[in-house]
Structures are given as C-alpha cells and as structure tokens.
Amino acid sequence: ELENEGLVEYVRNAGCSVKEITFEESFEIYLMRANYEIMAVRLLGGKIPEETLQEMEEILERMKSLNVDEYDQLFSYDNKFHSCLIRMTGMKSLYKAWKSLNYGNIVTGYNLASDKKAVIKRQYPIHKELLEACKSRKKEEICRVLSDHYMGTIHRLLKEQGMTEADTKFSLDFLIS
C-alpha cells in the first residue's frame, strides 16, 4: 500500500526504502497544493467556517508540542491542517485531487530531515501565521499568507539543494492571485 501511495520504493533483493523525490517533483506538488488551497479560500470568499478554524487550532496545538521522536507525525499534522481548507468547500473531487498530493509532502519531509528539530521548530510559527490569517477572514490576506507559506518551502528546498531559481526550468512566480 505504501508503494502504491508513492511513499516507498521496492527493489527486488534489496527491500524497501523511502522514495527519493526530485526538486521538480516537489515543486509540482507544492504548486498544485498551493493553488488548490488558494482556490478553496477564494471559493468561500475568505469566510472560513468557525468549525474549520477550531479544527485547525486543535491540529496546531498538537503540532506545537511535538518532539524529535515524533517527527513522523509532523507531516501527518501538516496534511491534516491544510486539508481543513480544502474540506471546508465540501467539494469531493477537489479534496480527492488535493489528497493525492499528500505523499509528496511526506516524502519531501523525510528526504530533507537532516535537522529534524529545526524542521519541527519552524512548523508551528508558519502554521500559526496561516491560522491567524484565516481567522481574519480576509480573502486576500489568507491567499497572500498561503502563497508565502508555499514559496517559503520552495525557496528552502532550493537553498538546501544548493540551487537558485536560475538552476530550474520554472519561474517561481506561479501562484494564482
């Protein structure tokens, strides 16, 4: 099942390992996730339902108290947190398309886990900022924070791989506005 979800690769006579993911694959996944989430916010005009905000707050609190031994839960919480924005639309096909990208977030997280403590530490404040923007119910503010959230990840991936935008075939000005 994990192989079908794209999380692990099986090599005959060698066993299973976490799938390697290229920058281009990560870029594509984050491009799509960001645009789906921005679209969800725009569909509701930024009016995030109270129950969605409550769920996001609960997930954020769990994320806040993670330690290095619980690193594997970080990306599960991240996916749950962001899924709130998609699920609030009630659009099943949108949710299915968004959810199909979860593996990329998980694999990217595991492949770049050189400093798990630093990764855990930065997750709370960036998700707190997103939650606060959602609480404002200001559509453009929420979309800006979402864009910054995903662009921060893209720029961090580039830096960690010793790359710049010039090293990619993509423009990093890709989010819908």
Please report, for each region that a protein language model flagged, where it lies by residue:
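Short linear motifs at protein or domain termini
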Residues: 1-46, 162-167, 171-177
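Short, hydrophobic secondary-structure boundary micro-motifs
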Residues: 11, 94-98, 142-144, 166
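Hydrophobic, amphipathic alpha-helical faces that serve as interaction scaffolds
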Residues: 32-47, 79-117, 153-156
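Amphipathic coiled-coil alpha-helices
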Residues: 36, 59, 66, 70, ...
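Amphipathic alpha-helical dimerization/coiled-coil segments
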Residues: 36-67
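C-terminal all-alpha effector/ligand-binding and dimerization domain
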Residues: 58, 64, 103, 111-177
